Amino acid sequence: MFNKVVKEFQWGQHKVRLETGEVARQASGAVIVDVEDTVVLATVVGAKSAKPGQDFFPLTVDYLEKTYSAGKIPGGFFRREGRPSEHETLTSRLIDRPLRPLFPEGFYNEVQVVIHVLSVNPEIPADIPALIGASAALAVSGLPFNGPVGAARVAYIDNAYVLNPTRDQIKASSLDLVVAGTERAVLMVESEADQLSEDVMLGAVVFGHEQMQIAIDAIHELVRDGGKPEWDWQPAPKNEALIARVTELAQNDLLAAYQLRDKQARSAKLKEVYAATSAKLEEDALAAGTVAADKATVGNILFDIEAKIVRSQILNGEPRIDGRDTRTVRPIEIRTGVLPRTHGSALFTRGETQALVVATLGTKGDEQIIDALEGEYRERFMLHYNMPPFATGETGRVGSPKRREIGHGRLAKRALVKCLPSADEFGYSIRVVSEITESNGSSSMASVCGGCLALMDAGVPMKAHVAGIAMGLILEGNKFAVLTDILGDEDHLGDMDFKVAGTEQGVTALQMDIKIQGITKEIMQVALAQAKEGRMHILGKMTSAVSGANTQLSEFAPRMITIKINPEKIRDVIGKGGSVIRALTEETGTTIDISDDGVVTIASTSSDGMAEAKKRIEQITAEIEVGQVYEGTVLKLLDFGAIVNLLPGKDGLLHISEIVNERVKDINDYLKEGQQVKVKVIQTDEKGRVRLSAKALLNEAAAAAQSDTPPQQ
């Protein structure tokens, strides 16, 4: 019934099992990957034909985590998984990026890759098994795919690279890098680092590429024994006559368009060329009595002509689209404190790319609580990236963030997080929001620069300035050119897009997407060195504008004080059902967080409110001591004495015999409910009962007065 094929191999410190032929047999391809009890099912379905008029490759990748994989039941009313989490979205992008370039040009059939996480070992992240599974599923499916792809995670611990580290090892590492590629080439890198050198980063990429070969070999074996027949797909033959005619009609005008340095003017000119070319082809068809070529086909030909123009100009040493040489960074303008009532803000402009970045400080209660498969944890630092359509002069949908925005936000967060002060040094939670107001390439790196400046404006004591730069590459045969600070058009027309962020000391984030095979270690070395040169230039501009973090927080930012209480007293501060702490926060206008070890953090924009909250918490948690004198309030009168409140929640008995020295016939002659009375604690017992005395203070006062009286002559 089943044609089950299994391949097993040892990969670093883990044993890996690939399996196909038993589960999801109606999919084009399906593979189960098991890495030390982290199990994923990767499936691929490809449409047998492209939709009419399709002019792009419709690939979708969905990585889905099932809560049952960790032995949990989902929260919420419906008790089932809902919209994808940020982690699922980021992992979907991570898998998509190395797979997409390996489908052949002209293949427009819809392809859907779905990965289900079925079982989770908390120590083994599921993203690498998912990427290996997706690659293997595509390989066994028979779809036209120039894979397989391998992947590896690399850590850097004690000056040594570690392959596919556990979660505990990742926490101890100064590097978390994921690399994916084929047998011959690296295709994708995603990383976060603690100010490491370019040599260490490149070494990690090379190490990961070498170590992934065993996974690629295992996929080849799986295909050999359990793969489906290869699809009989051939790209549509090129219409050489149409290509020649479009080139004749448009090439000179496209050349003229790329002499325009302004993006808006250039875009307008390109639209004119596209429209005029289509109109002329329709006239040709009408005159010949034939059907004109569809606009998608014409558009693809025009795009190819554009690419040839731009690429040849750069490789021949001519100026780039905006007139720069290959190493020059666009003009930079920096302004901080641009918004009056925010905690920190910066406007970072680089050429036609601009980011308005805002930093907000909060308390521990503002931290993001994430319920992940491996367990719940809190995020103290959040960074959100938004790019509305007006940033590129277009109209479009405005709403929840798209995958691209989530990915760019995470990259900027990775770049900054290692340079933040620790929670012990700076107890605030931090949210940074980057609003892209103009975009022409490298908006995520503008978010890094603007984010660092906004944090410093907010008074966050950053370890160092952090800057980011986007680089490009054009490669033809043995000739190549590395481009510093790429434009949007150069990104689309180039062969590699990689972004490097870091400080003067080293790299904090590296993201690389390579669209072709054949990029060597030497080319990457040149690219990283040129990126460092550009980063240092930007850091110089940033340091000149803002030398360091503000020493004063914004008047609108919360202030914090911390006190330590006995952990056994936490329940007294919280009260039944939270009644005490709720009343405290409402009456003092503060936010109060209490950790399990008894550290109380009080935050407010009002210093008076913080002082009052601190005083009341100290009163609630204070211990009644024998011999101490208190100013108490009479709560209740009894026949034999009075109940006096000394501290919040702490009362004592003032016996009728301890009010005054003479005999008291009627307690009402001496005390009234609500009266303030000074009393001394004379006894406590093991049950917590407290006995008070007022006459003891009277006797002490009388004795003191007598000792001050001069002797009789």
From Swiss-Prot:
GO terms for biological process: mRNA catabolic process; RNA processing. Residues 627-695 form the S1 motif domain. Its main location: cytoplasm. Mg(2+) binds at D491, D497. It is found in: Cytoplasm. InterPro entries: ExoRNase_PH_dom1, ExoRNase_PH_dom2, ExoRNase_PH_dom2_sf, KH_dom, KH_dom_type_1, KH_dom_type_1_sf, NA-bd_OB-fold, PNPase. GO terms for molecular function: 3'-5'-RNA exonuclease activity; magnesium ion binding; polyribonucleotide nucleotidyltransferase activity; RNA binding. GO terms for cellular component: cytosol. Residues 558-617 form the KH domain. Its EC number is 2.7.7.8. Keywords: Cytoplasm, Magnesium, Metal-binding, Nucleotidyltransferase, RNA-binding, Transferase. It is an enzyme of class 2 (transferase). It comes from the Bacteria. It catalyses: RNA(n+1) + phosphate = RNA(n) + a ribonucleoside 5'-diphosphate. Its cofactor is Mg(2+). HAMAP family: PNPase. NCBIfam families: polynuc_phos, PRK11824.1. Involved in mRNA degradation. Catalyzes the phosphorolysis of single-stranded polyribonucleotides processively in the 3'- to 5'-direction. Belongs to the polyribonucleotide nucleotidyltransferase family. PANTHER family: POLYRIBONUCLEOTIDE NUCLEOTIDYLTRANSFERASE, POLYRIBONUCLEOTIDE NUCLEOTIDYLTRANSFERASE 1, MITOCHONDRIAL. This is Polyribonucleotide nucleotidyltransferase.
